Amino acid sequence: MLMLALSAGALPVARGLNVRVLVASGPEVTVRLPVTPLNPPASPLAPAPVVVPQPFSENTWTVGVRGGVLTLNGQDAGSTTLYLPPSPGSMVTIAGKTYRGGVLLRAAQGSVQAINVVDVEDYLRGVVPAEMPPSWPAAALAAQAVIARTYVAARVNPAQPYDTCATESCQVYRGVAAEQASADAAIQATAGQVVAYGGKPASTYFSSDSGGYTASSAEVWGRDLPYLPAKADPYSAGGPRARWRLEVAAAQVQAAAARFRVRVGTLRDVRVTRTSESGRAQEVTLTGSGGTARLTGTDAGSFVRALGAASSRATLSGPVGPTTPLVVEGSGAGHGVGLSQYGALGLARQGQDHLHILGFYYPGTALSLLAEAPGTGRPVLAQLRPLPTRPALLALTGRHGE
C-alpha cells in the first residue's frame, strides 16, 4: 500500500491555540472551579499563563445578570465579562458538565453565556468520541480527528464572542465525560493536522452515511465547493441505513407541505420527479384537490427530510390519503456532503489510512499543519501537502466485515 508521511520539520504544531465554545446560556449558569474569578479578564485567546493564581477551596458560582452586568452568587460583579481560569490540571464544571480549560462568562441580552476556553487539542478529546463510536478503527478515528480540527480552525475568530457551539448545530462537544483512550490516541497521532484548500482550512462537512453516493455542496446548500462533489461511494454500502423504508401519515405530509407554503388543497399524490446526480431529491411534485405545486432545489430535499426521512436520497410512492400513508424509501443518513462516517469505517476496515480516507472524500485538498499567528490568536496553515486522490490497492467490495 502507498504510504504518505507528514513531516513537521522545524514547524511546531499549534499549542496554546484556544477555541471558545459556547456550552451553556440562560438567565443563570452554575460554574464550579477551584480558582477565584479574574476581573478584568485574562485574554481567552492567549496561551495559558506559566504562573496561575493559587487555587482556593473549590467554589461554586451562580452567575446571573442584573442591569446588564454579571452577578456572582447574587453580588454585582461590576463587569459584563469575567474569565475564570483553571489551575494546572484542574477542570471547570459548567451547568453540570465538566470541561478542560477555563470559562469566559458574558452578559448578553439579559442572559449569561458560558464559553469554555480550551486548547484545540483538548477540545477534540470531547468531540471525536461524541461524533464517532470510539470502538471504530484507528484510521477512521484519525480521519474524524482531522476534520473536527479543521472545522473549528476555520471558525476561530477573535472578533466574535465565541468560535463555535457544543451542539449538532456546530460540532457535538461533550467535554471530559466523552473522552476515550482510542480517540485520544487518534488526536495525538494527527496532532495539528488539518485539511486545506487554497491555503485555508477546508469546509470539512461530514454525515453519518452517504447511502452509496456523496452529495455535492451545491445540490444541498447551493454553494459549489470543488472539493465537495457528488461521487459514487461504494464504501458506505454496509451501514445500518444503507436501505430504509418509512410510512408517513397523510396528516403529517399535509403539515410538512404547509411549512413550505404549498397550497393545493387536500393532498392526493406526492412524488420525487427529479433527482440530482447523487440521487437526491431536486424536485418534488405535490398534487391535491386544488391543483399542483412543485418544490425545487434545496427545498425539495428539505421537504423530504421534513417527512422524517433520514436522507433526501429517497423516492416517494405517490398516492396519499386518509387511509393511504405516503411510502418513502431511501438510502443513507444525513446530508451526504463530504466524509461519510460509515464509508470511513469501510475504508479503514479495508486497510486504508486516514490520509487516503480524507483524500477520497475531499478530492483536490491538501494536508496541512495548524500553527498560530504570533500575538493574534488566529490559526495559520503551514507545509501543505496534497492528499492522495484515491484509495490504494483497494477491492471495491463495500463490506464492513473484518
Predicted regions mapped to residue ranges:
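Conserved, single-site charged/polar hotspot
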Residues: M1-E402
